[in-house]
Swiss-Prot record:
This is Tyrosine--tRNA ligase. L-tyrosine binds at Y34, Y171, Q175. A motif ('HIGH' region) lies at residues 39-48. Its EC number is 6.1.1.1.
Amino acid sequence: MTFIEEFIYKGYLHQCTDLDQLTAITQEVKIAAYIGFDCTATSLHIGSLMQIMILRLLQKHGHTPIVIIGGGTSKIGDPSGKEVTRKALTQEDIKRNTAGIKKSLSKFIKFGKDQGDAIILDNAEWLDSLNYLDFLRDFGRHFSVNRMLTMDSVKLRLERSHHLSFLELNYMLLQAYDFYYLSKHYNCILQLGGSDQWGNIVIGADLIRRISGKEVFGMTTPLLTTASGAKMGKTAAGAVWLNEDLLSPYDYYQYWRNCEDADVIRFAKLYSELDIIELNKFEHLVSEDINAAKKQLAYELTKLCHGERLAKLALETAVRIFEQGDIDENLHTFILAPEILQAGISAYKLFYNVNLARSKSEARKIIRGKGAKINDQLVEDENMTIDTNFLLDKKVIKLSVGKKRHILVKV
C-alpha cells in the first residue's frame, strides 16, 4: 500500500484539502510533513497516539516527519476545543514539559540527520524573535478577521459568551506562520492534526498560497472516543501517559487489555503495526477469541511504547495476577505511612486512601456490593479494622476491586 492508502485503511483520514493531488504527489516524490504538540504536560498521553503513529507511518514510507514542539505557541495557548482560557505556562513549565514530550516521541520515532529521519524543532526558535510590527505589516494583511470568527474554536466560545482573549485569537496566526516557516525552510507541504485543528491548518495553507504561490496541503484525523463514548487518553484514574515515570508499563498494558470488545479491531488498526493478515484475523474474531486478541493488542502496544522486555514483564505479571492468583511486586504499589497500619484503619477508608474508590461513600458501596477483597479474601464488613496483622510475607497487603483493579499496599 502507498502512504495515502495505508493512511485511509488504518482509519486516520477525516478531512483533506485536496486528497487526489496529495495522493499523486506522495506517489511521485518523498515529502516533508509536520504535526505540532503543545507543551502542556511533562508527557504525551494516548490521546496523541494516533498522531504519533502517523509520524511513524510517514517514516515507514520514506517521507520526512517534522515534529514541532510548541515552546512558542504554548506561551499563548490554543483555544481549539476549549471553553475556557488556558492557564498561562511559565518558561520553566515549558522547558520541563518540552523535555518530557521529547522523551515520549523518541519512544516511537527515529530522530537524526540521515535520509528519512524525523526532525524535531521548537517553534520558539523563530517565534521568539518575531518583531510584532513587522509581522503585522508582512503577514497581518493576509488574515481575514471575518473568516477567523467563523472557525469552530472561536465561534463556540463567542456563541456561549465565554471569554476569548486577543492573545488566544493570535494563536491561529502563529500556527499559520509555523506552516509558512516550515514550507520556506524545510519544503514542508503537509500539515496534519486532529479534527479540531482544521481551521488553523486551512488558514496556514491559505497564507502560504497568498505569499509564495505554493500549493500545500492539510489533513485531519477524526475525533476518537471509545465504543462507550469516553474520550481517548482519559480514565477515571487519570490520563494514560506514555512516559513510564507517570504510568507504569504494567498499567499501560492493563489499559489496553481492558478495552471494550467493540474497540479491539479499531485499536489494532489505529495503534498497532500488525500486518494486514493479522488485522484480518482480528476482523473475524468470535466471542471466545476476544480475550486472546486483547492480550495480543495490549502486548503489541506496550512493546511499541516501552520495549519488548517491559512488555513481556507486564504480560507475565498480568498472567500471574489474573490467571494464577499470585502476588507480584510489579503490580501498582501504594506506600502507606507505617503509623496508619499500626493504629489500624477502617477497610472503606483504606480503599479510599489508595484511590480504589473516588469517595468514602463509594468505598462503602463497593464493599457492600461484595466487590472488595483484601489478600484475595472478600471484605464483608466495611468498618473492619485493617492493621499490621494483614501484612503478608512480602510486607504488603493486596487490595482488589472487582476482577481487574488491584494494588499492593506497602509500609
